[in-house]
């Protein structure tokens, strides 16, 4: 064999082998290039709920692209965060998305994000209303059971214990429902009393609402912090609380508001109120005097009455309590005794005393003051001494 021929055969170029072997690396390169693009497409559905935190369900029906939701999730936003955000905060979030990721948001996506969040808020609100409706229905049945005569309250207490044990926290719901039920009863009484005289109706409403505001869930007088401190006449109070001169000035403001309400009623041809009623308090609130409210003014009206009927006794009482450092609650209770003494000298008719005074005629006499006068009159009638009713009540 020729050695040159053997050597030449080793280096002979065969175009068929070149054509058959050359294209083989290209599919590998194509597979390598195509594989990364197809693999995430098959992997995304399994990772959607875990990666986006529910954003895909929130934005799915509003034309939001998947990658837009993914970018929002990368910024750390969740469904709960977006629902609690305001509109301007959502605008800042979308602007940050465009600036940080250079991601162009479509106009429809901007509106779609806000629309999806509003829809989610409505859905959550509806679920909360339904949940509260179920709780209030259960607690209303429990309260109705207590309202029946002859029934024990042990089943109701047992239900409350079971609800507390299950983590329902229905004790607060019970208190809210009971307060709501009381107010509904008051409204029904008002509807029945519409045929009565306007003044008597208004007075009954005030007494009932005083009982509601003064009683807690379990009944009894609610202990509230007094917003005033005992001050001497013309003394300026220091600190967060106001003095008694400011308290008496509030009653003068109520008189001015009553005059304005009467003028408006005359212009409209309506019935003019002759006393400070709910209509006056509502007008004061609309006028910006929200610090004037009925519970406060009814609570200290007898103190203002003593100030108007006998200013010297009122000032002396204020000085004495200021020197002893007593609070305004004790001063308020002490104001009853001089008023009972004044009523004893004028036939025990506290309403006539109020109506005869120009500054007190617009106020209803306190129920407690009437009760004290009635009790003192009975004691005076049972006593053999004519002056017993006044001598045992020195200031």
Curated annotation (Swiss-Prot):
Q: Tell whether rRNA-binding is among the UniProt keywords.
A: no
Which key words tag this protein in UniProt? Activator, Developmental protein, DNA-binding, Nucleus, Transcription, Transcription regulation
Listed Pfam families? C_LFY_FLO, SAM_LFY
| Cellular component terms (Gene Ontology) | nucleus
In which tissues or organs does this protein occur?
Highly expressed in leaf, leaflet, inflorescence and lateral shoot primordia on the main shoot axis, and in floral organ and carpel primordia.
**Which residues lie in Acidic residues bias regions?**
202-211
The UniProt annotation puts the region (Disordered) at 147-170, 185-223
InterPro entries, per this entry?
Answer: FLO/LFY_C, FLO_LFY, Floricaula/leafy_C_sf, LFY_SAM
The lineage's top-level taxon is Eukaryota
Q: Does the keyword Transcription apply?
A: yes
Q: GO biological process annotations for this chain's record?
A: regulation of DNA-templated transcription
Provide the residue ranges listed under DNA-binding region in this record.
224-228, 293-300, 364-367
The UniProt site entry described as Interaction with DNA is assigned to 271, 278, 282, 329
One molecular function GO term is: DNA binding
* Location within or outside the cell: Nucleus
Please state which protein family the record places this protein in: Belongs to the FLO/LFY family.
Give the protein's function. Answer: May regulate indeterminacy during leaf and flower development.
What is the protein name given in its UniProt record?
Protein UNIFOLIATA
Q: What is the lineage of its organism?
A: Eukaryota, Viridiplantae, Streptophyta, Embryophyta, Tracheophyta
**Gene field:** UNI
């Amino acid at each position: 064999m020729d050695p040159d021929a053997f050597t030449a055969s080793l280096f002979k170029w065969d175009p068929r082998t070149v054509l058959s072997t050359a294209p083989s690396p290209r599919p590998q390169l194509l597979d390598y290039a195509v594989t990364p693009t197809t693999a995430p497409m098959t992997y995304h559905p399994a990772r959607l709920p875990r990666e986006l935190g529910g954003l895909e369900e929130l934005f799915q029906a509003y034309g939001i692209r998947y990658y837009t939701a993914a970018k929002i999730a990368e910024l750390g936003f969740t469904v709960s965060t977006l629902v609690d955000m305001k509109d301007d905060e959502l605008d800042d979030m979308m602007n940050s998305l465009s600036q940080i990721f250079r991601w162009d948001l479509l106009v429809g996506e901007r509106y779609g994000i806000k629309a999806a969040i509003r829809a989610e808020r409505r859905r959550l609100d509806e679920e909360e209303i339904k949940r509260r409706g179920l709780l209030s229905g259960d607690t209303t049945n429990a309260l109705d059971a207590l309202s029946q005569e002859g029934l024990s309250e042990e089943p109701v207490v047992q239900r409350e214990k079971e609800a507390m044990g299950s983590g329902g926290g229905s004790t607060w719901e019970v208190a809210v429902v009971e307060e709501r039920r009381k107010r509904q009863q008051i409204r029904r009484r008002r509807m029945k009393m519409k045929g009565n005289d306007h003044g008597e109706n208004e007075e009954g409403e005030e007494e009932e609402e005083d009982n509601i505001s003064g009683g807690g869930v379990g009944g009894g007088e609610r202990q509230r912090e007094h917003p005033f401190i005992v001050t001497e006449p013309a003394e300026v109070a220091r600190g967060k609380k106001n003095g008694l001169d400011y308290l008496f000035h509030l009653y003068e403001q109520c008189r001015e508001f009553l005059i304005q309400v009467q003028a408006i009623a005359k212009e409209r041809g309506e019935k003019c109120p002759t006393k400070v009623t709910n209509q006056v308090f509502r007008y004061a609130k609309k006028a910006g005097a929200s610090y004037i409210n009925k519970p406060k003014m009814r609570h200290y009206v007898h103190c203002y009455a003593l100030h108007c009927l006998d200013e010297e006794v009122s000032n002396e009482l204020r000085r004495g309590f200021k020197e002893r450092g007593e609070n305004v609650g004790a001063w308020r209770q002490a104001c009853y005794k001089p008023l009972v003494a004044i009523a004893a000298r004028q036939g025990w008719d506290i309403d006539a005393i109020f109506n005869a005074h120009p500054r007190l005629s617009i106020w209803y006499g306190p129920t407690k003051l009437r009760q004290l006068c009635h009790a003192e009159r009975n004691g005076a009638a049972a006593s053999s001494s004519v002056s017993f009713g006044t001598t045992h009540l020195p200031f």
